[in-house]
Amino acid sequence: MPRAVHAFAWGGTLLAALAVLLAAAAVEGRGPWEGWDEGRELRRPGYAERVWPDRPIRTRANTFSNLAYMTVGLYACGLALSDRRRARLAGPETSAGNVVVATPALSALFGLSCLWLGFSSGLFHASLTRAGQRLDVAAMYPPLLSLLAIAAARALPARVGRRGNASVPTWALLAAVVVLAEIALWRWKWSMSATTVLSTLIAAMALVTVAEHLLWPGRFRSAWLGWGACLLAAGIACRQSDVARSFPVGPDSWLQGHALWHLLTAAALGTLYLHERSERGARLHERSEQGARLHERSEKRESSSDPSASEASRIEGDRIQQERS
């Protein structure tokens, strides 16, 4: 990964943290949330962290831990900019076969969704207002919707409509669907179960990734899925123990169960994005399989009477596997 992407992500996260600290210091003692409708968690906390009703940031750990979503979002946006620059310099053929790399707008869509989640969830945990809660819950969905949009883009043509200038990029239509879905989920937030919607999206994402591995075996790095599943399971465990008040820390600790939920689910979203980004083109995949077959063939022929042919086959297999990497 380019160093500039790391600098972009961590530099942006640091700036966001400084902005929150400066804003909180500027309104300290002024009651910035007065006049806002209180959320249920202000008087009846749903999480174990201590609530400070008179402070600009009413729950510290649960607020600042949302920077993790912003870091993931900034990484995705940074990679989108890097992919766009690389395509301009080296040509679009360098990313042939990888939908995410070839379509920087999809990375930007996912990145902006994570940034929106970090902002909305941070606003809720800082304010504990009803409006903040509505944004927080609705913002949970766009990152998963964006990942589903990436999978859909892989199965659809790059452009939709008539040939020529009249056609529309598929990514633009998918982005519009994600935005409209987010608006609808925000609009009807109070009339639906957030647990049901989120569980449905997670299940849909799981089915889609399994289908990708069945349709295109070997073209994705499945290890990212394993990491994502472990991180999600750990995040759920931390969240549930926090709600049950069984997480082994005090209410003033920065290591809260719900804060770890933010950190771990942000990391899980990052691994799912990297899984979608790990796609290899069909041609490269075929050549890697050919190299593996030549390697196996050379091992079987090591004891044959023609060592030169075995050595040539082994060298050819090594060359193809080096091209793969």
Locate the predicted segments by residue.
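Multi-pass alpha-helical transmembrane bundles in non-GPCR membrane proteins
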Residues: 2-280, 323-324
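Ala/Thr-enriched low-complexity intrinsically disordered regions
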Residues: 94, 282, 292, 309-312
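Long, intrinsically disordered low-complexity tandem-repeat segments
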Residues: 282-299
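Long, compositionally biased, helix-prone stretches
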Residues: 290, 322-323
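Arg/Gly-rich low-complexity intrinsically disordered repeat tracts
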Residues: 301-304, 324
